[in-house]
Regions:
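Extended, low-polarity transmembrane helix blocks
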Residues: 1-45, 49-78, 85-159
C-alpha cells in the first residue's frame, strides 16, 4: 500500500518516476510499431553470456522471432501507456521490470563482453536496463497509481 509514502512531495516524485518510465516504454514501443523494418534480430544476434544460444534459436525460427517482436512492440507500448495512466500499476511495473531484466540478461554490461553495437559509455556491470529495472521495482513497492492514477477509479470498491 502507498501508506508507506511519507509526504506529498515523495508521492509526487514517485508519480513522476512512474510517468517518465512509462513515457520511455511507450515511446520505444510506438517507435518499433511504426518502423516496418524493426526486428529484435540484430539485438538477439548480439546476445552474449548465458542466453546467447536461446537468442540464436529465436532468430533462426521466423515464427518465434515474429512472436518475440510483437511481444516486444506491444508489451512496451501497453506497459508504457498503463504506467503513464496509472492503470494496473503493480502488475505493469512488475512486467516492465521483468522485460528490461530480460534485455539485461541477453546483453549484460560485463567488462569482458564485447558487442557489435557501440555502447553509450563504459559500463562495468550496471547499465540503463538494470537501473530502469530497479526503478520499476521502486514503482512496484510504492503503487502510486492507487492514489494518482486510473487504479484509484477502477479499483475504488476494492479498497
Amino acid at each position: 500500500s502507498t501508506s508507506n509514502v511519507i509526504d506529498d512531495l515523495q508521492l509526487y516524485g514517485l508519480v513522476v518516476l512512474r510517468v517518465l518510465i512509462g513515457w520511455h516504454f511507450l515511446y520505444e514501443g510506438i517507435a518499433k510499431l511504426l518502423n516496418p523494418y524493426w526486428s529484435s534480430a540484430a539485438f538477439l544476434l548480439d546476445a552474449k553470456w548465458i542466453f546467447s544460444g536461446l537468442a540464436k534459436w529465436i532468430v533462426s525460427n521466423p515464427s518465434i522471432l515474429s512472436l518475440v517482436d510483437n511481444l516486444n512492440m506491444w508489451g512496451l507500448t501497453l506497459i508504457g501507456a498503463c504506467l503513464i495512466l496509472g492503470l494496473f500499476g503493480r502488475h505493469v511495473s512488475m512486467l516492465g521490470m521483468l522485460l528490461v531484466l530480460v534485455y539485461y540478461l541477453f546483453t549484460p554490461s560485463f567488462w569482458w563482453l564485447e558487442y557489435a553495437r557501440p555502447g553509450e559509455g563504459s559500463y562495468l556491470v550496471v547499465n540503463k536496463n538494470l537501473i530502469e529495472a530497479c526503478a520499476l521495482f521502486v514503482v512496484y513497492l510504492f503503487p502510486t497509481s492507487e492514489l494518482i492514477g486510473l487504479d484509484r477509479l477502477v479499483f475504488k470498491n476494492n479498497s
